[in-house]
Amino acid sequence: MSETTEATGAASNARAKGASAPRFWRSDALPFIEARSIDDGRKVCYAKHSHETFSIGAVTNGRSVYLNRHAREWIGSGAVVMMNPDDVHACNPVAGERWSYRMLHVDVAWFTKLQHELGFNENHAFRAFSQIMSLDAGLFDGLNRLCAILANDDDTGTLRKESAAITFFSNVQQTLNPTTLPERDASGQLARAAEFIAENCTRALKLDDVCAAAGLSASHLIRAFKQRYGMTPHAYLINRRIQYSRAQLRRGAPIADVALDAGFADQAHLQRTFKRLVAATPGQYRC
């Protein structure tokens, strides 16, 4: 094999690896929003997970299987997906097909304030979206346009980027016009259980601790919690640890320290779990 052929092959492999690696964008000046994209996600594999943010993404190439709570749909290029905070979901490519997407995660408090300013809520509480997927071309184009503006390193000012974010999410609100989800867990016991887990996610929690906080028996808690949140209390705990880890990594904390602080056995344990739920390594996310 000639040196030219070897060099060409190496460059091709580098491009392939680059296309399959997730890219993240975030800015200290705009802490309420984070963007993620991948050009070739055919090897991506997401386990069921949730976010503490409102998340919206666009499939730009290929097809995937989209799970959101109890719904399962096959979606393709042009689809826009929406995930309310804490809604369990997953989106994975059809086997062997090149798959690309862009995703935005936005702070709930920021979006709630925008909803209030637009007249969609009166009590300053986030209004969840009942719709989980849309084929609206305006939303699709707007999301891609916002991602391009955010990722433009030549534009160092925040005014254009923040204005573009407000414009897009105002359009999301006007287009989807969310309705309040049916009231669940009127007694608040499950909410107390979830809150207790979230506040103590870095500790070595026992099931008895969660039961005591919620005032529920273990059998009822496990059954009702999974029905309400789409995952067991343990899975919810792991998700919260990953959310905590993401926040620490964004601040530049060393991965080994994050692993121990978040309650994982070691860095390898964090690495495996992070990859399974985020479809990226802690190092890729931290960059």
Q: What are the roles of these predicted feature ranges?
A:
Residues 123-140, 147-214, 227-239:
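Short, Lys/Arg-enriched, Trp-marked, Pro/Gly-tolerant hinge/linker segments that flank
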Residues 198, 203-242, 250, 259-287:
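Basic/polar phosphate-binding segments, predominantly the helix-turn-helix DNA-binding elements
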Residues 1-30:
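N-terminal low-complexity or simple alpha-helical regulatory segments
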Residues 256:
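Conserved ASCE/P-loop NTPase catalytic core
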Residues 21-124, 154:
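N-terminal regulatory/effector-sensing and dimerization cores
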